């Protein structure tokens, strides 16, 4: 299992606060049943960070209203 670091995610979302919000919103989506865009062996928060680090999810998460 490869480790995910904040630095990997900050390459795609440079603001730490926006990164935390985007990861939170995406993790909530995953819990609600949305399909993960990367391999989903881990908890939803880790999967969300992996998606951000791979560039498949980004700042656009902040423009969506969480439900």
Swiss-Prot record:
Catalytic reaction(s) noted: RNA(n) + a ribonucleoside 5'-triphosphate = RNA(n+1) + diphosphate
Keyword Nucleotidyltransferase: yes
Documented EC number(s): 2.7.7.6
A GO CC annotation given for this chain: DNA-directed RNA polymerase complex
Source organism, top-level taxon: Bacteria
GO BP terms: DNA-templated transcription
Leading EC class: transferase
Gene3D superfamilies, per database record: 3.90.940.10
Pfam families: RNA_pol_Rpb6
GO molecular function, one term: DNA binding
Swiss-Prot/TrEMBL keywords: DNA-directed RNA polymerase, Nucleotidyltransferase, Transcription, Transferase
SUPFAM superfamilies for this protein: RPB6/omega subunit-like
Keyword match Transferase: yes
NCBIfam families: rpoZ (TIGR00690)
Function as written in the Swiss-Prot or TrEMBL entry: Promotes RNA polymerase assembly. Latches the N- and C-terminal regions of the beta' subunit thereby facilitating its interaction with the beta and alpha subunits.
Subunit structure: The RNAP catalytic core consists of 2 alpha, 1 beta, 1 beta' and 1 omega subunit. When a sigma factor is associated with the core the holoenzyme is formed, which can initiate transcription.
Family as reported in the entry's similarity comment: Belongs to the RNA polymerase subunit omega family.
Protein name in the entry: DNA-directed RNA polymerase subunit omega
Gene designation: rpoZ
